[in-house]
Each structure stands twice: as structure tokens, then as C-alpha cells.
Amino acid sequence: MDLKEYLEYVNQGKKVIAGSREHNFMHELAQEAMKITTALNNGYHEPDKIRELMSKLIGKEVDESFGLFPPFYTDCGKNIEIGKNVFINAGCKFQDQGGITIKDGVLIGHNVVLATLNHDINPNKRGDMQPKPIVIGENVWIGSNSTILPGVTIGKGSIIAAGAVVTKDVDENVVVGGVPAKFIKKIEE
């Protein structure tokens, strides 16, 4: 299996069966991601070097406007799309097997978790995983210690309050918060 074939498989939302070739390839990608994130996280790097390492991690060039404060963790890396003027603060953890799209102007606070996989609820198949993408619209601000769960789309201009657990799609230009996250108010432009 190669990367293209793997991404086509998971981006169709097909279940990853424990022990399958897709599952084994997922583990190969995790090993590569750990090597790159270890280099990223264990020492000081100028912004250009951070962008270079992040580009290597995701397999495509990040824009010169991209900013990241390490440490940063991911167990895949190759299914992340990052727009322009994106900033990711320290301690974030991205589980991107299901796909993460971060559009232009997004700000991501400290210790945010983006999780794109769920395990099977059947205890006899618990090792199986279901990928679902996360899409973060333009100019979204995700507050520190928030968790975004599989399949969530966050509409442009919205704010996710610190500590929120987002389980459902978020409309454009709103503030949501809480566990689970609920509507707080509309943002007037």
C-alpha cells in the first residue's frame, strides 16, 4: 500500500479494520510522524525551520504565513491541509487519519485536540476505526483545551470557547462552548 492509496481509502470514510493492510500502513505513517515531531519538539527552531519540518510532516509546503509554537503532536500528518495565516499554539494534538482541513486565518489555542477517528462500539471489534474528517472554516478561533470530534465542520468566523468539546457541526459566525459545546451567541460583523 502507498500513501495515495491509503488516503483514498480513509478519505472515503471506509472503516479501518484492526490488522488490515490499511491499519498496518497507518502504523507506518505513525512511526514517520513520531520521528518528525520528535525533531520538531526537542529543541529550539527558527520559524523557517518549523515551517520546513511541518511541511515534511504533512507532505506539502505550508505557506510562509504559517506559525506554530511547539510542541505539536500527530500520529499521521499526511492528511492535514493548512491554509494561509494559520497559527497553531503549543501542545496541540491532531489525529488526522480521517482528514483535517484548516482554512485561511484560523487560530488554534494551546492544547487543542482534533480527533478524526472513532473506535468501533462493539467490544469484539474495538480495534476497528472509523475515520471522519474535520473541517475548520476561514477565520475560526479555537480556544485552548478544546476538543473537536470526528466529522465536525466549523463554519467560518466562529469561536470555540476554551475547554469546549465539539460533537456537532458549528454554524458560521457563532460562539459555542461547554461540554458538549452549545450555541452561546451570534457574532455580529
Language model region names:
Residues 153, 167-168:
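Active-site/ligand-binding-proximal alpha/beta "capping" segment
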Residues 1-65, 181-184:
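Terminal amphipathic alpha-helical/low-complexity segments used for targeting or macromolecular assembly
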Residues 116, 168-173:
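Short arginine-rich
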